[in-house]
Amino acid sequence: DEALEERLSEIRLTKDAFELEEMIRAVEVTKAGFEDIIRVLPRAVGHRRGERVIEGAFAAVAREEGNGEGYETIAASGNHANTLHWIDNDGEVREGDLVLVDAGVEVDSLYTADITRTLPVNGRFTEVQARVYQAVLDACEAALARANQPGCRFKDVHDAAMEVIAARLHEWGILPVTPEESLSPEGQ
């Protein structure tokens, strides 16, 4: 029934103290999993299935501290990071690569965190990697700032991020028009 569906959706938007605690717990345990990923990166380098070394480190924390992984972990190194929702996790991890990890732990209450990070395999970004990483981080921060404004719609959050990305692409000479032109309805 449509009315029930709408009411349930509204209820899901508001969290009580218990739900907030569980969401925070899911994030804390997921963060611990990411910390273990960082610790195993040196072992993953050169391993024929280094992506699985990364996935396994996260899965161990998820199983020990929660119900397990809340969804299939993406551990995509190098060119695999270009494949949307890469879950094979069967590739090598090479020095100089970036590894994209999207993972979350499901805690006992069934709440699941969802964290995505791009990590430099050797612990340091190249100059170009750092510039791109900073642009994405700035876009994320702009989106979060917009999300915290009263009356904000999802589209407003998306637009805030896209404004930053368009500006950076223009600064770097990649965007052939102004950011305003690219973001206008005609530029879409």
Residues covered by each model-derived region:
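Active-site neighborhoods and metal-handling regions in enzymes and metal-associated proteins
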Residues: 1-188
